[in-house]
């Protein structure tokens, strides 16, 4: 019989961040208890505070991880698109489609992003969100080779995608746009 694998502190930290991301995505910063996070992660609350000094530290770690996932998504899709085309519009489109696939595969990525934006009333959280959002902007601009206006359009469309995705099942980008143009929203 082989002995059970003991997780390192780094592995346990990663598990706690993953559990926190799920809880914070649903309940937000203020509405999520560290007890719920500890239970989901399978650790005690005192151990959670050993790993992360405060609830805010844990929230910030989850937000950073969420932005890193989004950045990796943009980097990977941008690099692949650049092998097929040097046209910035084509590269941006590929990155946008990859982002939609990321949100569809893991809706908590979007939910946590939105919770991060909502928690920006806190100066420390705002600083982390701002820095990471700027890094996303820089990554998209550099990888796509697009001019600043095109990058601005990419992020504006991304925010619209975020709104449509957060509305929930049954609403598509196309029928949402139709409703913005004067029709009634249609549920699929």
Name each model-derived stretch.
Residues 64-70:
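Short, basic, alpha-helical segments at the C-terminal edge of helix-turn-helix-like DNA-binding modules
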Residues 103-121:
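Amphipathic alpha-helical segments used for helix-helix packing
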